[in-house]
């Protein structure tokens, strides 16, 4: 009996028993409801091939696909006060930071890097939306300022990929201060005669839209990206009118002259490098 219990039954269970399936093995398309194999989605730059829906892409994945041969140098994350207001909502802000750092492997919501895109050197700044909604606080603001300074030192363009809900509530007025700080940094970049290109991705809202996201020399956007300040529901309740279909989507904005061009994620490296070459040549 012991032989059956200890040897035969475990072997049978190992053959016929249920195997654990990873939770992220399949991803559901928000547009069509189709199930997509996670590995295929990742290899296709987080674009669902059947519907061409652009999913949110991790910041480092975007850098990998942007730079030539996935080679780039990450810029150091500035050291700042982590919880200046000792803020607490339903949990301590410092604990929320620890959770998001563990989840994403990042220090904060901004990742910056320098490298070559189609043999053209540039600095790229990318929002990580999964880090507290890509919100901007002291650390993110300082990272953007340092990225602008690095671009000026390297005499190369800066490309910004936005994906954010806006200012970080847990840092209060200190978060709002980053909006004029980053605006000044962008103006320094422009005063140096260097191109500043913004790629608006889904979603780009709040204080980020009200500051550096809309200060580019050229504004590109991914298909279907939500871009605006306040949300659709808030606007409708305020003006008491029904907004047009597709309002605040990139297609609506390019039609009404708010952005310059919609670019498929697969084409971004080629388009960005071409624009950088044209803009850099024009100021030489």
Swiss-Prot record:
Matching Pfam families: Carboxyl_trans
Keyword terms of this UniProt record: ATP-binding, Cytoplasm, Fatty acid biosynthesis, Fatty acid metabolism, Lipid biosynthesis, Lipid metabolism, Nucleotide-binding, Transferase
KW ATP-binding (keyword) present: yes
Organism from which the protein derives: Liberibacter asiaticus (strain psy62)
Lineage of producing organism: Bacteria, Pseudomonadati, Pseudomonadota, Alphaproteobacteria, Hyphomicrobiales
InterPro entries on file: AcCoA_carboxyl_beta, Acetyl_CoA_COase_Trfase_b_su, ClpP/crotonase-like_dom_sf, COA_CT_N
Keyword Transferase among UniProt keywords: yes
Gene name tied to this protein: accD
Name of this protein: Acetyl-coenzyme A carboxylase carboxyl transferase subunit beta
BP GO annotations: fatty acid biosynthetic process; malonyl-CoA biosynthetic process
GO function term, MF aspect, one: acetyl-CoA carboxylase activity
């Amino acid at each position: 009996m012991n032989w059956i219990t200890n040897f035969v039954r475990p072997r049978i269970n190992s053959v016929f028993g249920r195997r654990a399936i990873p939770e992220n093995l399949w991803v559901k398309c928000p547009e069509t409801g189709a199930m997509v194999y996670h590995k295929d989605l990742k290899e296709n730059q987080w674009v669902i091939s059947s519907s061409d829906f652009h999913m949110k892409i991790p910041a480092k994945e975007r850098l990998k696909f942007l730079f030539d041969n996935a080679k780039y140098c990450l810029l150091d994350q500035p050291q700042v006060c982590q919880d200046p207001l000792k803020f607490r909502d339903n949990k301590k802000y410092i604990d929320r930071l620890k959770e998001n750092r563990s989840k994403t492997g990042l220090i904060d919501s901004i990742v910056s890097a320098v490298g070559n895109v189609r043999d053209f050197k540039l600095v790229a700044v990318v929002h990580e939306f999964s880090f507290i909604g890509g919100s901007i606080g002291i650390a993110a603001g300082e990272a953007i300022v340092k990225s602008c300074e690095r671009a000026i030192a390297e005499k190369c363009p800066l490309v910004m990929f936005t994906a954010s809900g806006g200012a970080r509530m847990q840092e209060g007025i200190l978060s709002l201060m980053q909006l004029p700080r980053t605006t000044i940094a962008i103006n320094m970049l422009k005063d140096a005669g260097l191109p500043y290109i913004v790629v608006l991705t889904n979603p780009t809202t709040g204080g980020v839209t009200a500051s550096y996201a809309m200060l580019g020399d050229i504004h590109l956007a991914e298909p279907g990206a939500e871009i605006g300040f306040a949300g659709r529901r808030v606007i409708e309740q305020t003006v008491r009118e029904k907004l047009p279909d597709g309002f605040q989507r990139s297609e609506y904005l390019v039609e009404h002259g708010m952005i310059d061009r919609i670019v498929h994620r697969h084409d971004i490296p080629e388009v960005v490098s071409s624009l950088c070459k044209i803009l850099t040549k024009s100021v030489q």
